[in-house]
Curated annotation (Swiss-Prot):
Pfam families: G3P_acyltransf. GO terms for biological process: phospholipid biosynthetic process. This is Glycerol-3-phosphate acyltransferase. It is a multi-pass membrane protein. One of its GO terms (molecular function) is acyl-phosphate glycerol-3-phosphate acyltransferase activity. It catalyses: an acyl phosphate + sn-glycerol 3-phosphate = a 1-acyl-sn-glycero-3-phosphate + phosphate.
């Protein structure tokens, strides 16, 4: 790999490490999302603890965190495997942020941003899948897991050369939701509309 790839991996991780949920909550005077709600510093939990505009800001910033490094990678005409590593680094930064004691979010919005930069069509299909599952069952976590499991097939259909890198990112997302999966299995996960 070239020095450009290594630099973009570091940049992606550091950008991913900027926890917008914590920053937006501090600016809006909301409680720390790591200590309230689901204890997850992400857009869904910020919405859950009462900050609609902050949640939107978090969502957009987290999407940008994944999308920008991947767009730069495409600009440098890197290989799909290298672009996949950069996308993975952004997600790892969000999940294990250097600047916030490695206590991060689930990485869904950041992964979506990266995938959006790789394939708009596949990302649109993934978003539709997420929405359908959410509207049917009301679980954000279930929507994320099912979408992550299906997304590699969408990518294979539209851009097969990115199937393996995207599958790695999706595996990370599923792993990050292991606690949610256990609660879903036990019937202990509450739907979004049941939470205050």
């Amino acid at each position: 790999m070239s020095i450009t790839v290594y630099l973009l991996i570091v940049f992606a991780y550091l950008l991913g490490s900027v926890s917008s949920a914590i920053i937006f909550c501090r600016l809006a005077g909301l409680p720390d999302p790591r200590e309230n709600g689901s204890h997850n510093p992400g857009a869904t939990n910020v919405l859950r603890i009462g900050g609609k505009f902050s949640a939107l800001g978090v969502l957009l910033f987290d999407i940008l965190k994944g999308g920008l490094p991947v767009l730069l990678a495409f600009n440098f005409k890197l290989e799909p495997s290298e672009i996949g590593l950069i996308a993975l680094a952004a997600c790892l930064g969000h999940i294990f942020p250097l600047f916030f004691r490695f206590r991060g979010g689930k990485g869904v919005a950041t992964a979506f941003g990266a995938l959006l930069s790789i394939s708009f069509a596949a990302s649109a299909a993934g978003l539709c899948t997420w929405l359908i599952v959410f509207l049917l069952f009301g679980y954000s976590s279930l929507s994320a897991v099912i979408t992550a499991l299906i997304m590699p097939f969408y990518i294979w259909w539209f851009l097969p050369e990115f199937t393996f890198p995207v599958a790695l990112v999706c595996c990370l997302l599923v792993y990050r939701h292991h606690d949610n999966i256990q609660r879903l299995w036990r019937g202990q996960e509450q739907p979004m509309w049941a939470r205050k």
